[in-house]
Design a protein with these regions (language model features):
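Oxidative protein folding and maturation machinery
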Residues: 20-154
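Sec-dependent signal peptide recognition
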Residues: 2-9
């Protein structure tokens, strides 16, 4: 009799366990690329626009997406790193004043994201990327001028 009760209890536990929802998984989003306004015609103006506004959608404080060891504001960290390297390349196409404005813009917006959500890793990720790409002596993109603009924001 006790064996029958035991089997019924185990079967009930298994049936109850099967009915639970699985933890919801978040699918990484593509990087939110910017669209160049149609009024911008010259390549230089386009480079300046991209340099300054490249991160606008990514660092929008209203953007509420998961951030963890693999995701930054919903975007895969690897994808974000590639976009960061691309952005450094764009900075090389503009004058120093524009690059300073672009760097200031990025880090001010990342700081706003961090203040809005202390669990966010947006600011920390950009901090790591600045060290890796702008400051590291082994980086082919190393640029002390860019890093100084970034460090001045800290």
């Amino acid at each position: 009799m006790s064996k029958r009760i035991y089997i019924i209890l185990v079967a009930a536990a298994v049936a109850a366990g099967c009915g639970q929802k699985k933890a919801e998984r978040f699918t990484a989003l593509p990087f939110p690329d910017i669209t160049l306004p149609s009024m911008i015609q010259s390549q230089q103006d386009a480079a300046e626009y991209y340099a300054v506004h490249y991160w606008d959608k990514m660092t929008d404080p209203e953007r509420a997406y998961p951030s963890d060891s693999l995701l930054v504001s919903g975007v895969r960290k690897d994808d974000l790193e590639q976009k960061y390297a691309n952005w450094i390349g764009v900075l090389d196409l503009v004058d120093l004043k524009t690059s300073e404005k672009a760097i200031k813009n990025l880090y001010d917006k990342a700081l706003v994201c961090e203040k809005k959500d202390g669990a966010s890793n947006v600011f920390e990720t950009f901090e790591e990327l600045a060290d890796k790409y702008m400051y590291n002596v082994n980086s082919p993109m190393r640029n002390e001028e860019y890093y100084l603009h970034y460090a001045a924001r800290l």
